[in-house]
Amino acid sequence: MIVYEDEALVVLNKPAGLSSEGDLPARLRELWGAPDAYVGVIHRLDTGVSGLMVYAKTPAAAAELSRQVTQSQQAYAVLDGRAEPDGMAAPSPVFVKRYRAVIAGVPDEDLPAAGVLRDLLFKDSRKGRVFPVRRPRKGVREAVLEYRIAALSADQTRSLAEITLHTGRTHQIRVQFASRKHPLLGDGKYGSRVKGSIALQSCGLAFRHPVSGERMEFALDLPAELPWSAFSD
């Protein structure tokens, strides 16, 4: 589960089925044999999603990594045209999250082979779901992601998508693809008829070390099991 660890942070390969705010910090404290150890949550993954996450081991590291997350959100907003540059050239995002997903279908008019998806999303907390809407209103937030279709299954029924998040909305990737009639496999909440875990993996993570400033990059291989194995050749 642990990919990298030092005195300031720990990078994990989160298994599907564990919550990123409750289960994983508890597992870390158990591994360390330190029930009161500090574990700073920097970003989140849905419980049913697997892949890379970084946690801070000190409040100072948490503050710096959180600052990088905020900087990256602002940088993407400028790059996407959602915000004006602050008198200078738009900075490059520092904290970068990349994903891969297996989605139903192949590229079509609703979902070209590559592009940027922009939607207004409304989170209905009572129903535990997120819905795309057409107009801004209270509780609605803009969601933006960049993607490309990297491969098609041999039977031309599924696609492997590589995704870079520009915003970090609840269920964002799942909803944006499902709203274009390409739900993620295993995501019954948003329309998939395939049973199993949600076919979404946090496969890449990059940031600056909160103490040294060194650029750190982590990547995961394509999982060996279905449905990922359909794209392993």
Where are these regions (language model features)?
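Short, P/G- and charge-enriched loop/turn segments at secondary-structure junctions
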Residues: 131-137, 192-194
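Residue-level recognition of short loop/turn positions
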Residues: 126-127, 167, 211-212
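Long C-terminal interaction/binding lobes of large macromolecular proteins
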Residues: 147
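Short Pro/Gly-enriched beta-strand edge/turn motifs at strand-loop
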Residues: 127-131, 142, 183-190
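Pseudouridine synthases involved in rRNA/tRNA modification
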Residues: 1-22, 85, 156-158, 170-233
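Short histidine-centered loop motifs in beta-beta connectors
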Residues: 161-164
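RNA pseudouridine synthases
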Residues: 1-127, 135-142, 151-153, 225-231
